[in-house]
């Protein structure tokens, strides 16, 4: 975290950056939100309450959010969510977004705002150059979502064991 190794229980504060290495993942819980940060990823937490809650700068982040509004961002989109589970994978020129379940307001950079709801991975997207295009479900599983929901003190609507894609 912030260029130094983190230990279990290390607090995460506004302005912190969490990076994972090639063979490492990180799981962290902030209030009623839980996150599974994949290998080779970098996530930046906003510096003020007016800032974006978190920005996925590189790699993948599976997130489960409790009640209330949250905002995420990548280089190619700003994402407003509420009581939602999503997976984001940020690449240099494009981003992958899967609304696993919940509701989203998606604003691609220089593109039109898209609002939608899903119940089970119905609309994964690539976001690039202000446009969205259909995608397959990649790099996250129902079992990971079930695990994160348990860390956040909730149960998932998916059956135990979940699906793999």
Place the predicted regions along the sequence by residue.
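Flexible, surface-exposed loop/linker segments and immediately adjacent secondary-structure boundaries
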Residues: 1-17, 21-165
